[in-house]
Amino acid sequence: FAADEQAAAPAEQETALPADAQTAGEPEQQLTYVALGDSITSGVGLADMKYNIAQIGYDLQPNFEGYPSQCYTALVGKGLGLDRQHAINLGLPSLMSPDMVDMVQSSAMPKMNQASGSYYVYPEYQEYLRKADIISIQIGSNDALVPCIVGLGEATNWKSEQLAGLMVSGALRDFNFQKLGLFFEALNRMTLTFDESRATNRLLFRGMDEICDQAYTNVTASLPQIVAGIRALNPDAKIVLLGYTNPVPLLPAWNRYFSKLNRFAKDLAAQEGLIYVDIPRAQTAADGHPTVKGHQYIANQILNALK
């Protein structure tokens, strides 16, 4: 799936060291940018994403340097004049924030995440972090999304695929009565039994709060550990902390969750000397992942923050 034509950037685009730091005849040195994240970072939904089927889940190692040319890792790398050996995509689909803590601390998840179905072990994960000059962190959406989608499936005996797709698509982002109608239309099409309807209503109007409260606790506990783990490996790296886009503002629980997370991330960045990058309007596709324009927007936000 790799885009071979993106494999190397022209020398004149590479980031050069100051003249007095170079020796005559030596090639110009490049920075190294490493993007940590989940499926948003990896480029799920874009053409040319690379992966292999693994014994458990998927092997994303081919995507570390063979990522889609339209994902924000590629676009940030291009903006910084980096080739693919110096712009690394460590996005791991379905990753949740405690999983990223494990990856940063030991390059491995100790066991499979049963809720998300993910399990990753990459010895090179920490090595990439040690060599990085700039590291971006994107994590936390799955901490709420995965249990919400699983809970909706269990409540409806898995009749909820269309409603779940609508919820994560971004189609409900801008509230109006037409979109509220879409939501209830999808809900009614599921032809639920009385017990299923009761369980679904409880989840949507109460259970979501419980899920999002627990997710917020998990993410706010994990993010400082992720930052500390990165600094233990690489105290000199510049760390960029990405904010959050809410694909379902129609649901009050999700509004509160992402609003609180953005405030927490911004405060954490100020306390820890990180670069906070707000991405509230990243456009998403029907699967809830950024579109090409969404990745362009995220990349532009990062590059502007690095200026």
Report residues per predicted region.
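Residue-level detector of flexible, active-site-proximal loop/helix-junction positions
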Residues: 40, 94-96, 246, 283
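Short, solvent-exposed loop/turn and secondary-structure capping segments
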Residues: 44-48, 100-102, 146-151
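Alpha-helical cap/lid subdomain in secreted, periplasmic
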Residues: 113-307
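Serine-esterase "nucleophile elbow" of acetyl-processing enzymes
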Residues: 15-93
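Surface-exposed intrinsically disordered loops and tails
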Residues: 49-67, 106-121, 177, 199
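Structural motif
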Residues: 95-107
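Sec-dependent signal peptide cleavage junction
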Residues: 1-7
